[in-house]
């Protein structure tokens, strides 16, 4: 019993650690839906996309499903004038996004220091260099002013969209609670030995 309790505590700590570490690496999520579009629509389509930003590399993983018609394009828009609202120009087009499908997945990596990944109008509007465009995009993501948009034939202005939001970073209290819990388990195990 004592040994299984210790193993259980160790397993719980190991299970929590990767999730907490991953959140600190620059993980961004976008939960896209029809009601989040501008204007809102009744599409049952959805996506829970993940963007991982490490240095100048942004990796996108965009699964999507239940769209009402075939896809025509997808991209990241930036920079709205207020968080979680408004429309903005295209910042990064997904040039190889799967077209004509109602569900699927898209994965790609973007080098934010490469001018060719940006829409030319976005690049020009934000300083004309990849460094300034990338800085504007990162600032907009931090301010919740950038969004993912998937367009379809039925909704050419966009069937589903979701604002990019930083995944929650655990507060120091989370680690403290984990430490207190493990210490408590250790004390219980020690008591039972005596």
Predicted region positions:
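Metal-centered catalytic cores of metalloenzymes
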Residues: 21-74, 78-168
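Detector for methionine-enriched segments
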Residues: 1, 58, 73, 177, ...
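Gram-negative bacterial Sec-dependent N-terminal signal peptides
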Residues: 2-20
């Amino acid at each position: 019993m004592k040994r299984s309790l210790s193993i259980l505590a160790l397993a719980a700590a190991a299970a929590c650690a990767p999730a907490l570490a991953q959140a600190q690496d620059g993980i961004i999520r976008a939960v896209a839906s029809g009601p989040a579009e501008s204007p809102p629509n009744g599409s049952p389509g959805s996506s829970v996309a993940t963007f991982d930003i490490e240095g100048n590399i942004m990796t996108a993983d965009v699964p999507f499903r239940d769209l009402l018609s075939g896809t025509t394009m997808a991209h990241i828009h930036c920079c709205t004038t207020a968080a979680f609202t408004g429309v903005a120009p295209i910042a990064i087009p997904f040039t190889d996004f799967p077209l004509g499908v109602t569900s699927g997945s898209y994965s790609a990596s973007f080098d934010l220091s490469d001018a060719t990944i940006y829409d030319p109008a976005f690049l020009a509007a934000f300083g004309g260099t990849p460094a300034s465009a990338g800085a504007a995009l990162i600032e907009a993501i931090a301010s919740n002013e950038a969004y993912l948009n998937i367009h379809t034939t039925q909704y050419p202005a966009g069937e589903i969209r979701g604002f990019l939001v930083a995944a929650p970073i655990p507060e120091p209290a989370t680690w403290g609670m984990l430490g207190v819990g493990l210490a408590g388990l250790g004390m219980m195990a020690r008591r039972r030995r005596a």
